């Protein structure tokens, strides 16, 4: 890992954090961006939240994560876009980008010469996916949906050995 991380013309030194607004090329739209370049070597994780503007829990989680992590304690880098569909967020639109009526989640890999949804997807596909070792796209219940708390923890079934197994009989 080098001492700097470069993303979309931004350079972030090792052990530092950057919070800024990222312009979507060919538009007047800017997306909130947080980059944490950890003090130690490690992989790069890309996190997107708010592909659907009304999915508030993922947006809030990404914002809190960006605020709370100390780059001096991080191995690798974390890049977060939150909310990606900033126009849908402000307009309280559940599934679409208001300017073009498209579901941003359905237009990847995007098109730099297309509509706002396509340009946004194109920016993420061309500038962020190549940087990432891992990618997490946060989705959740939307504006009209009821959220019930739950945790899903997959694990392997483990059974204790029987006395016969232990004795070898």
Q: Which residue ranges define each predicted feature?
A:
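Single conserved hydrophobic/aromatic residue that forms the stacking wall/gate
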Residues: 158-169
């Amino acid at each position: 890992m080098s001492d700097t991380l470069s993303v979309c013309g931004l350079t972030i030194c090792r052990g530092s954090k950057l919070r800024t607004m990222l312009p979507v090329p060919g538009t007047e739209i800017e997306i909130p961006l947080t980059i944490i370049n950890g003090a130690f070597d490690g992989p790069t994780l890309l996190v997107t939240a708010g592909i659907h503007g009304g999915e508030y829990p993922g947006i809030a989680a990404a914002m809190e994560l960006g605020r709370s992590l100390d780059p001096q304690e991080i191995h690798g880098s974390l890049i977060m876009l939150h909310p990606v569909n900033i126009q849908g967020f402000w307009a309280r639109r559940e599934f679409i980008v208001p300017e073009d009526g498209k579901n941003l989640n359905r237009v990847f890999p995007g098109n730099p010469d297309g509509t706002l949804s396509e340009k946004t997807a194109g920016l993420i596909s061309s500038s962020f996916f190549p940087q990432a070792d891992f990618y997490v796209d946060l989705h959740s219940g939307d504006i009209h949906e009821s959220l019930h708390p739950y945790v899903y923890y997959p694990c392997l079934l483990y059974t204790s050995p029987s006395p016969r197994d232990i004795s070898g009989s």
